[in-house]
Amino acid sequence: LNSLTDNALMLRVKAGDVDRMGLLFERYHRKLFGFLYHMLGQAEASEDLVQTVFYRMLKYRHTFTGDGEFRTWMYHLARNVLADHVKKNRHSVRHSDVADYAEKIGGGVGADEQLQREQEVATLHSALAKLSAENREVLVLSRFQELKYEEIARVMNTTEGAVKVRVHRAMNELKTIYLRIEN
């Protein structure tokens, strides 16, 4: 079962074998958390939204056709869940402690390395937070979630060329902001 593609697993879930959702959860929980965390900056809310995305995958499994990539469909659902959350909590969005995120990504490193990593993550997160939601989303999908431009175009309902331009501009803007914060 571990060798089944994501599409094959989701098609089984669609056919009623909902136990297969556990494998998809194992494969994508951390990636979805990373996407949502980079967009929101709130570890606890991001974890809750991951659960909501998987709930919606089950609820709307009948809409999965298997024609496109499972990841594209999943991130489309995640964008909708995120948009709903932001609308509902417009006035309470805040960025959580870097320590929460550093704990999530973990790793056994020394105290000095850990502190430096946390500082770099904090600076990067601050820079990402200053980007527009569109620029932040395209960077998170391309750089952190490692989606191909073609997949991002389908998720965002735009062209591959437009995605390339947005990523390039967003990277330049992020670099400028990061260097400004660092100095």
Specify the residue positions occupied by each region the protein language model found.
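Structural recognition of an alpha-helix C-terminal capping motif at a helix-to-coil junction
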Residues: G34, D48-Y55, G68-N80
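Internal acidic/polar
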Residues: N2-S3, S92-R117
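Hydrophobic positions on the alpha-helical face of helix-turn-helix-like DNA-binding modules
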Residues: V53, L77, L139, I152-A153, ...
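Sigma70-family region 2
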Residues: K14-A15, G41, T52-E69, K88-R90
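Arg/Lys-rich amphipathic alpha helix in sigma70-family domain 2
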Residues: K59-G66, H76-S96, R117
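N-terminal module of bacterial RNA polymerase sigma factors
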Residues: L1-K31, A129, T176, R180-N183
